[in-house]
């Protein structure tokens, strides 16, 4: 969802559920880790573009990502920079996850990895790096 809506909606749902902000809250983020930021970005763009356009846009999911002032969806670079997708090297993704945790209180993270859309060996390596390198540092 666009960042302009995040805090308000999180506060509304926390209040409605009788919980503290962030308590029991999870989020889904695309996660792709590769040897370079450029490789990870390309893997993400290739897989997320297909998945988004085929599986989410037809059902209206993109509307929540639109900038309320411009009506524009974030570019790939903006999505990564804002933490909507955790994409890059181990160091880049670790920094992104740490920044995301400072910004949004969450208890758990669902790692959307675009199974079958990312070449299998690269996907397995990405998951391995996330679980063995990123999570121990930023988890």
Provide a role label for each language-model segment.
Residues 1-139:
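Active-site-adjacent structural elements that line small-molecule/cofactor binding pockets in enzymes
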